[in-house]
Amino acid sequence: MKHLWFFLLLVAAPRWVLSQLQLQESGSGLVKPSQTLSLTCAVSGGSISSGGYSWSWIRQPPGKGLEWIGYIYHSGSTYYNPSLKSRVTISVDRSKNQFSLKLSSVTAADTAVYYCAR
């Protein structure tokens, strides 16, 4: 019984902590080819400046799996998917506790559901 209880604590504790944090995407839902997609992710229940965390954008094209776009550390350092690197910018606005995605020169291949995550 002790082992089971310990296991439950390990699983439940991170979920309890993460449940305090909420992310909400917003932005243009429809963009014409060659234009720039701009999305924002508002963070509530915690500070975007908290050390040790990265803030990510991912997407899921219709009928396909998740694709990592990139992420930004609390420090401002960014890391992008090499296949999208030339068109992607991720930035943080600490005053508004939010981070943003810009994807330029969009094509039909960029059609997807976009998600922000920590």
Curated annotation (Swiss-Prot):
Keyword Secreted: yes
Chain segments carrying region Framework-1: 20-44
MF term (GO), any: antigen binding
Entry keyword Transmembrane: no
Keywords from the UniProt entry: Adaptive immunity, Cell membrane, Disulfide bond, Immunity, Immunoglobulin, Immunoglobulin domain, Membrane, Secreted, Signal
Domain of life: Eukaryota
Gene Ontology process terms (BP): immunoglobulin mediated immune response
Subcellular location: Secreted; Cell membrane
SUPFAM superfamilies xrefs: Immunoglobulin
Region named Framework-2: 55-71
Source organism per UniProt: Homo sapiens
A GO cellular component annotation in the UniProt record: plasma membrane
Name assigned to this protein: Immunoglobulin heavy variable 4-30-2
Cited SMART domains: IGv
Region (Framework-3) location: 79-116
Region Complementarity-determining-1, residue ranges: 45-54
Quaternary state and interactors: Immunoglobulins are composed of two identical heavy chains and two identical light chains; disulfide-linked.
Annotated segments matching region Complementarity-determining-3: 117-118
Designated gene of the protein: IGHV4-30-2
